[in-house]
Amino acid sequence: TAPVVARAIKRDIEERLPQNLGALASIGQTFRSLAEALPFGRIRRDFWSRFYFSKGPAAYDAEGVAGAKRVLHELLAEFKSASPKPGHVDFVGAGPGDPTLLTHRARVLLHEADVILHDRLVDRRILELARREATLIEVGKTGFGQAMAQDDIHHLIVEHVARGAQVLRLKSGDPTVFGRLDEELEAIAAQDISYSIVPGITAASAAAAAVGRSLTRRGRNAQLRLITGHDMAGYAEQEWRALAKPGAVAAIYMGKKAARFIQGRLLMHGADPLTPVSIIENSSRPEQVIRAAALNALTEALQDMAGPAVLLYGISPQSAAEHVFQPREADLCR
C-alpha cells in the first residue's frame, strides 16, 4: 500500500502547485540579490509568494521568461514603495516539552515567525519547527542562576517589532502561568504594539497525566493551587495552614531548590509527614522521571535530580509502591 499512498500524495502536491513552478524558480533565483533590498521577514516572504503563486504563473504563461522578469521588477517596485507593515508579537505556550503536545496554532506561528525569543526550557525539537531563516534568541532564566534581565527581554521584543518583524515570544508551558506575561504585556502596551496570546499545556497538567492522576477529585479536594517555590524576593510564602490540611492539593512550580523550605513550612503548620508528593522531572520528554515521596522524605528524593521538575503535593502516582522514598532515621529525628 505504501507505493499507492506515495503516488497519491505526489499527485495531490503536483495538482496544487503551478505547472510552471520549476521555470519560475529558475527565474527567481537570478533575482534574489535584487530582492534583498526588501526588509527581511514577512515583506520579503510576501513578495516571493505573490510572484510564485499569483502574478508569476500568469505572466509566464502569457509572455514566457520576459513576462516573468517584468512582473518581478513590478512587484519589487510595488513592495519597495509600500508603507512598511507594523510588527506584531505572539505570546505562545510551548507546552511541557513533547512537540506533539503543541497546539496547531502554535505550530503555525512558529513557522511564520521572523524572530523567536524563547525560554531556556523550550525543547530543542520544538525550536527545530521554526523556519530556517528565523532568528532564534534564548532569553532563558535559571533558578538562582544566570538569567537575562526582564527589562532586556522587553527591549528585545520592542526592538524587533519596531523593525516590522513578526515576533514569537515562546514560553515553556502556558504563558499565563508563572511566565511573567503581564510584565511583557505592559512593556508592549506602552508602545501600542499588537499582540495575541496562545495558550499551551501547563506543566501541572502534563505532570498529572504522567502519574495517571486527576488534579481534582470529588471528596478529596475542591480546590487546586498552582504555587511557585520562589519569587522575586526569594522563597515564596504561601497559605501554609490551608495547604497543611488533609486533602489539600497543589502543583508546585520551581520547587526543587525551595523543597526544604516548603517541607519545613508545611510540617510546621501541621501537615501529615506522610502526605504523598509526586515528583515529575522533565515531564512529557523522553528523559522523564517519576518519583513518589512522603513529605518528610521530599528533600532526599530530590537530591540527584538535575532537570526541571513539578511537585504534585497531595497526589501519589498510580503505581508508586516501588518508587516511594522513605525518610532515614536521621531525617525523622530533625
Map each language-model feature to its residues:
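Flexible loop/N-cap segments at domain edges
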Residues: F91-V92, G97-P99
